[in-house]
């Protein structure tokens, strides 16, 4: 399903849905969004998720931003995101680090730092 719907992300950013495809095998919508943010930084994942929820009527816990790519200085970002039918499917398919990233939590990397090792 090809679509050109507009999505208002913030006062300084607006997006256009370039591709909205239903993947019935997995149970999700796969959306490609082009975001125009001239003169401002790349919109946050949370802002993009909120805008998609308002525009498409989904739930926040079912939306995952897969990728945001911005060319330096261009003011245009390409966003890939998925909207799932259920949280169970989302948790089976998407990597945990993406779920943590969209939730705004940071994972601690393994290993200890800060004087624990023997220094000479």
From Swiss-Prot:
GO cellular component assignments: ribonucleoprotein complex; ribosome
One family name in Pfam for this protein: Ribosomal_S24e
The entry lists its GO molecular-function terms as: structural constituent of ribosome
Annotated region (Disordered) at: 101-120
Q: Which UniProt keywords apply?
A: Ribonucleoprotein, Ribosomal protein
PROSITE patterns, sorted: RIBOSOMAL_S24E
Q: Which domain of life is it from?
A: Archaea
A single BP term in Gene Ontology: translation
Question: InterPro entries this protein is in?
Answer: eRP_eS24_sf, Ribosomal_eS24, Ribosomal_eS24_CS, Ribosomal_uL23/eL15/eS24_sf
Give a yes or no for keyword Ribonucleoprotein in this entry.
Answer: yes
In which family does this protein belong, per the annotation? Belongs to the eukaryotic ribosomal protein eS24 family.
What protein am I looking at? Small ribosomal subunit protein eS24
Source organism per entry reads Saccharolobus solfataricus (strain ATCC 35092 / DSM 1617 / JCM 11322 / P2)
Upper classification of the source organism reads:
Archaea, Thermoproteota, Thermoprotei, Sulfolobales, Sulfolobaceae
């Amino acid at each position: 399903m090809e679509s050109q719907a507009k999505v208002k992300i913030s006062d300084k950013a607006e997006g256009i849905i370039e591709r909205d495809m239903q993947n019935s095998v997995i149970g999700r919508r796969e959306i490609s969004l082009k975001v125009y943010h001239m003169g401002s930084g790349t919109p946050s994942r949370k802002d993009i998720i909120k805008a998609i929820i308002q525009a498409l009527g989904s739930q926040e816990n079912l939306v995952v931003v897969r990728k945001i790519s911005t060319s330096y200085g261009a003011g245009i970002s390409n966003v890939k995101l998925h909207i799932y039918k259920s949280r169970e499917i989302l948790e089976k398919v998407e990597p945990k680090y993406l779920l943590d990233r969209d939730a705004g939590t940071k994972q601690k990397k393994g290993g200890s730092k800060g004087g624990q090792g023997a220094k000479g």
